[in-house]
Amino acid sequence: MANQLKTVLLLGVLTGLFLAIGHLVAGKQGMIIAFVVALFMNFFSYFFSDKVALAMYGAREIMYEEAPWLHEMVEDLAKRAGIPKPKIYLAPIAVPNAFATGRDPNHAAVAVTSGILQILDKDELRGVLAHELGHVKNRDILISSIAATIGGAISMLANMAYYTAFLGGNDRENNNPIASIIGSIILFIVAPLAATLIQMAISRSREFVADEAGAKISGCPLCLANALRRLEEIAHNPQIQEIASQEINPGTAHMMIVNPLSGDFIMKLFSTHPPTEERIRRLEELARKMQPGYGF
């Protein structure tokens, strides 16, 4: 519940930032234009991102005859989650990972890499798939699309401020054009940065929500915790990092269950995933709470 509230608050802050910058830069009319353009830009992303992401990794649908145990696992988890069974895809890449895509539970797909099928045991894989179904159940693709729409509109407004200042369109009631240009440059840099940081924070909060949802769907928080621990250890392997840099598109890293790309402290500010240690700690705490007799 706390992470759900955090998501709502962050979306509110992002919206407030957009309204404030829009009114400051272009007034009501310019603000509406920027929002509409950003909305159309993300319309394609919302409806077709699943096909783009799957094609990007050369993923193919896994038929029931190929892996009946995997289909039965996903079908059981989907029933427990109360959603339709999604299609299952295999991404032929060595980096162990998984992701979900699709705009709603009726148009969803889960993808596993060949690497993750080789690394995890069935209990751990079940935990991972439950996490991905948690994303589907919670409509996280829709939430990220809303955040991207507002963030995109903010970036467009910042660009408008930058070019308007240099073209002299901001001269009305302005006796200090130098200050206007400096202010526009600052806005051009800071506004998109602030919007991006908020979008990343929303993404991190959704990972916590999906972890909890997945743990409850599978009934085994420790299965997911063990999988995350193993995947995180592998992600720090220099050889795997080299493979990830070649196989993983940074633009889709946010979709993965763990961030396959390494980075320093600054990069972590822009990370779409919370620290894996914190995710594991929360799952272990949830496992204790789910034990019979807890709190009595």
Swiss-Prot record:
Entry membrane topology: Multi-pass membrane protein
Kindly list the GO molecular function terms attached to this UniProt entry. metalloendopeptidase activity; zinc ion binding
Transmembrane annotation, as ranges: 7-27, 29-49, 141-161, 178-198
Q: Which InterPro entries match?
A: HtpX_protease, Pept_M48_protease_HtpX, Peptidase_M48
Which compartments is it annotated to reside in? Cell inner membrane
- Give its E.C. classification number: 3.4.24.-
Q: Give binding positions for Zn(2+).
A: H131, H135, E207
Q: Name one Pfam family in it.
A: Peptidase_M48
The name of this protein is Protease HtpX homolog
